[in-house]
Amino acid sequence: MTTRMIILNGGSSAGKSGIVRCLQSVLPEPWLAFGVDSLIEAMPLKMQSAEGGIEFDADGGVSIGPEFRALEGAWAEGVVAMARAGARIIIDDVFLGGAAAQERWRSFVGDLDVLWVGVRCDGAVAEGRETARGDRVAGMAAKQAYVVHEGVEYDVEVDTTHKESIECAWAIAAHVVP
């Protein structure tokens, strides 16, 4: 089967966004990219502090409420509909719930051919990137570095601790079925 979607999972500052841009460059066909960060940015600001939305704790923790979950589900269904209509889709996500988050995605994608990719990065390295970026809550990268991978099954895993995004993209691209 032809790969219709590539779903990358990794903690904050693991290097997913850079890999996505490199994948778009190295893959011969056009691939659309969507990330959980852009979903959050598309939501009204009140969703970023409301009890039912998404909350970023001072220690780097993230709490997800039912209103956020509902909108996230609608977003995922829309993205999957584009893949079913013929678009090739790359998803940049953070599976805060580990295996449960992957199962939610599985329920949306159904029988689509998906390449599941784990993007790992040492917690201390991710934390250093987080500090350099300056646009994340301190502690988020360290908290997410390992927990997002718990119980998740991948077709491909890459580690950005010592590898550049382009190297990781080439490794992932080798598993994409045209």
From Swiss-Prot:
What EC number is given for this enzyme?
A: 2.7.1.-
KW Cell membrane (keyword) present: no
Q: What family is it from? A: To M.tuberculosis Rv2636.
Task: Kindly state the subunit structure of this protein.
Answer: Homodimer.
- The UniProt entry annotates the active site at D37
Superkingdom as given in the UniProt entry:
Bacteria
The alphabetized UniProt keywords are: Antibiotic resistance, ATP-binding, Kinase, Nucleotide-binding, Transferase
Know the name of this protein? Answer: Chloramphenicol 3-O phosphotransferase
Ligand binding (ATP): G10, G11, S12, S13, A14, G15, K16, S17
Q: What does this protein do?
A: Inactivates chloramphenicol by catalyzing the transfer of the gamma-phosphate of ATP to the antibiotic's C-3' hydroxyl group.
Q: Name one GO biological process term.
A: response to antibiotic
Q: Which NCBIfam families match?
A: phos_trans_CPT (NF033114)
Q: Which species is this UniProt entry from?
A: Streptomyces venezuelae (strain ATCC 10712 / CBS 650.69 / DSM 40230 / JCM 4526 / NBRC 13096 / PD 04745)
Molecular function GO terms recorded: ATP binding; kinase activity
